[in-house]
Amino acid sequence: MPVMRSTVQLIGLLIAGFCPVSYTYAYGALGHEIVGEVAATYLCAQAATEVEYLLDGESLGRASRWPDWIRKDPQWRKSKPWHFINVADDGRIAAVTGRPGGDVIWAIDKFSAELAEQKLGKLRRAEALRFLAHFVADVHQPLHVGRREDRGGNRIAIVIDGRKSNLHKFWDAQWLLKLDRSSHGYDRDGQIAAIRALGAGQAETLQSAGVLEWARESQALRPAVYAFSLTGSGEFDEQYRASALEISRLRLAAAGIRLAGKLNDIFCTQAGQR
């Protein structure tokens, strides 16, 4: 799996301190939006047209936030397990996906198929697009491919900037953007440009990997995710923060490029553009 190996090797260099880092955030609402905006720049013409039609002009980035908004709706409570998959450190992801209730890999396959099915109608396919965009981002967050015993880091208590939190939220929560004090901060367009630049020239390589491999990459990052020590106040040290945040930037870039690849496979092949 050359893509996964190269990704893990790059992360190893970052953690060892051989690569400069800058602060950013993980997959809160704005993180999902950025994945969608990065994807939009890699769409073929037909895919861009279909996305605009299905979303009635709403941006792919904003539409991808919808699956988090509807999780408490009784109609969509069933979607909660679709955001993640539990697997042991040495477990085979292919052996645990597709179980009753679903998981993030199962969901990506399900909504890819629904999006491609013209007979389902616009509303159903628009929902499928929103789910697909969201879950492609989720599977790139290392703790969405997590350990069952600590609920993907949710049971590991930490403190960030003086506030009680947990390991999962450090990698996933919107407020991590506050850590970006050295560059773009809350400048949405600046963040999108910075994340997009990380994937420049990598589309063909990144899109050659399948969904299982995306999840294996997240699983392979687990040693880096759990390699932390806490200060007396329960906070991470600066080296861990910097390395973790740079990993998040790389995963956001990969997620956006791969989401575009999925949409191009669905729409552009049908239109003879690939």
Spans of features found by a protein language model:
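Positively charged n-region of N-terminal signal peptides that target proteins for export
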Residues: 1-7
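N-terminal, motif-rich segments that launch catalysis or mediate targeting to/interaction with membranes
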Residues: 22-135, 142-274
